[in-house]
Design a protein with these regions (language model features):
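Solvent-exposed, charged helical/coil patches
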Residues: 1-73
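Short, charged/polar micro-motifs that form catalytic or ligand-binding hotspots
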Residues: 47-54, 121-125, 151-152
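Active-site metal-binding core of divalent-cation-utilizing nuclease and nuclease-like domains
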Residues: 52, 65, 69-106
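Short, solvent-exposed loop/turn segments at secondary-structure junctions
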Residues: 77-80, 118, 153-154
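Short beta-strand-loop-alpha-helix junction that forms the active-site gateway
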Residues: 97-130
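C-terminal structured domain segments
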Residues: 119, 123-142, 153
Length: 171
């Protein structure tokens, strides 16, 4: 109903619920400390002028923007390292910075998106497995509220699959 009012009338009315545009604007205005990039980080900049770590992250960010999906780059999430261990009743928090923290405007559900871009590096793959385990221990599951994409030097990120993921989870 609110969306059907003229702009001058909208200024006189306070809607009971936020429109999608208002909700997205408020969601995007949340301030957070960005993870630092190294001084010699490659110069990959998104359409939103964000300095990202890889060409694949640039592609994901630009595809999210083109699809109208609000996202935060490397938004910090607080995780409990002892969440699943009954022998450690005390909290031991750490921060994970998913590559993208995305908002499905239709459902207003948030998704962490991890792009694992060097899966043919054994050390990287091992750290990725530990990170995914920590996500699961803190209630983030693939297909529920966690999106995972990955690539190796031989198998790059598929733009077709990426667009299907966006349509399935974020539209």
């Amino acid at each position: 109903m609110y969306e059907k009012l003229s702009a001058p009338r909208q200024q006189l009315v306070t809607p009971l619920t936020l429109t999608d545009e208002q909700y997205a604007d408020a969601w995007l205005k949340v301030e957070y400390r960005h993870k630092k990039l190294l001084d010699d980080a490659p110069p990959f900049f998104t359409e939103n002028n964000e300095h990202v770590r890889s060409k694949s992250e640039k592609i994901i960010a630009d595809t999210l923007k083109a699809a109208g999906v609000p996202y935060r780059y490397e938004f910090p999430l607080l995780m409990d390292k002892n969440a699943e261990d009954p022998d450690f009743p005390d909290y031991d928090f750490c921060r994970l910075h998913p590559d993208f923290y995305c908002l499905n405007l239709r459902t207003r559900q948030e998704f962490a998106w991890e792009h694992l871009g060097m899966m043919d590096d054994p050390d990287y793959a091992s750290r990725a497995a530990e990170k995914l385990q920590l996500y699961a221990e803190n209630g983030f599951f693939p297909g529920k509220n966690l999106i995972i994409t990955m690539e190796t030097t031989k198998k790059q990120l598929s733009s077709k699959i990426m667009k299907e993921i966006i349509t399935t989870y974020l539209k």
